[in-house]
Amino acid sequence: MDTRRAFAIAACLALAACGGSGGGGGGTTGGGTGGTTTPPPPPAYTDSNTYSSGGSSSLASPNEITAVTKHSLVIGANTLNYTATVGHLTAMTLANPTPEASFFYIAYTLDGASPGTRPVTFFYNGGPGSATVWLHLGSFGPKRLATNAPSTTTPTPFAFVDNTESLLDVSDLVFVDAVGTGFSEAIAPNLNRTFWGTDVDAQVFRDFVMRYVAVNGRASSPKFLFGESYGTPRSSILVNLLESAGTQMTGVVLQSSILNYNSNCGVFDTVTISCYAYVPSYAAVGAWLGLVTPPQPVAQLPAYMALMRPYASNVYDPAVRAWMAGTAPSGTIVTQLAADTGMSAGNWSAHFNMDPGYFHDNLVPGSVIGFYDGRMVAQRGTPLAADDDPSSTFYNDSFSSTIVSYLSNDLHYTTPSTYTISSNAINVWDFSHAGLQFPDTVPDLAAAIAQNPKLEVFSANGYHDLVTPFYNTEGDLARLGAPNANISVHFYEGGHMTYLDDVGRQQEKAELAAFYASTASTKVAEAAVPAAPSQPFAETPRPTGTMPAAAFEMKLRDPMLPPSLRGLKPTPPSTGDALRAEVEQRLQSLFDSARPKRAGLVTLEEARAAGLGYIANNFQAIDTRGAGAVSFDDVKRFMRARGATTLPN
């Protein structure tokens, strides 16, 4: 066996956290005050492990060998020299650390910056069952595919260009694939499907983030999560778990959210809830396509949406509820909806509680529009309409071919395995969470803020997204109180992947940079300094092997439910005292996970053994009586004293 690999496996299985080269997690290169020196990388190698996305698959012998390369990027007046680190890192259980899963990741770290103060952001897509190729190659990494959205005539494959809107000038970037996607796989005796559920998925992501932080000396770094689509409920649960485990986070970016499956009418086949929150998005799409009356210029879109929000809530929604009870809508409402959205009055009369699938099929006769981006249109019978969503089909080939060539040619990582862009995990996914059959993660986000009142949330939304409509997200977040000092909500031209639109991406980058700079714990961080000059460095040589083409195991539609669940009935969202009780329940369940020997009391040792770092790190302050054990009421009092406002009195 290769001695490097043998060492990596031994380190992986024996240590919960290590600081050596086995982790390979992207330490910075010398040249900056407080910076560390990355040891020379190993020689060129092809990762000979065979990775599988199958539900019954698992990895017998993980390794943590990495490919390390040097690059530069010009943003504005600054040239940023950075290190790319590609490979696997093992997530360990909190209690009695044992290997769970081997996560495939790509980290980009700024040369010369101090890891103690430099922000680090963890990116992931959703699905569930989607690899992070979309955020990695489309959003704020150092390179991106130039898609020119919403055009459907841009030559493909798209040009792969330096990304002048990258977030690398404000944060180190870690793109990580979920278990059973990309090259990430469970470690035996676990199986991939062991982690295919709302709760277990968030738990194993927690363990990856904590391991990465420990291996790479990032405990004091400002830390951010950046999840898209299903990645947003993952983020809400994950940030609560991280805070409870004692890993304090600085911020969460929610890209195109579905925080509560139960509030999104587009998730279900049997529409038992009002689709009112989609109406502003319908109007935005109709306006872009020139179908509304009177016409609405693109520059006036925010003002148009400001009119459509109250109309959807105060006029359309009550009419839908009356329609569900048997009262036909008035002709006035139907006529106004037709003018506002471009959908015919006849279609509104026939399908008054209009779901996005019907809108997608019927807005443009003879054509389909995109779900991910309603501005994209394809005539039925053409290749672009073959998978029923031109805003997915048009991008798939370029993203799938580029990830393979980029990994091998630029980042010097190869494996004989197939990179899985979308697995079939969703067909067996356990969506239940906190007693509900479909996740409502607004209470989890509130519980995280209760533990860390300084946590800040950035919600990014596309006006033309027909999968996770922006007004639905506004309603979900409004349950936490509006205005809420912890939460900022932002809107952009574009669809689900706002960053594919050049205008939307530039605006989002500017607002994200301001968000990072304004967060309390990053004000002293090296957030926007140019990199130090690149130091002499022996890169991992480019391997001679080639990789198979990337694969889609199923048609991409994120977020969604499998057919077996789409006919079930959602649960109405909680508000007020009921919501606060749910927040308390989330925190109580974490407290109870310590399984205290004395009912209702947890000792310092029990908190540590259970991985409850929040309690362990603050134990003396929580234990005001000096009893050597604390109750959940003691923990709540401590949270309130630190500014928590989402807990019951």
Enumerate the predicted regions with their spans.
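C-terminal motif of bacterial Sec signal peptides marking the signal peptidase cleavage site
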Residues: 14-17
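Catalytic histidine-centered segment of alpha/beta-hydrolase-like enzymes
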Residues: 495-505
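N-terminal cap/lid subdomain of alpha/beta-hydrolase-fold enzymes
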Residues: 42-54, 97-194, 478
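Alpha/beta-hydrolase fold nucleophile elbow
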Residues: 217-230
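Alpha/beta-hydrolase fold catalytic core
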Residues: 322-467, 479
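Acidic Ca2+-chelating loop motifs
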Residues: 596-608, 625-636
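Primarily EF-hand calcium-binding motifs
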Residues: 584-599, 615-627
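A catalytic-pocket lid/entrance helix-loop region that shapes and gates access to the active site
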Residues: 142-146, 240-340
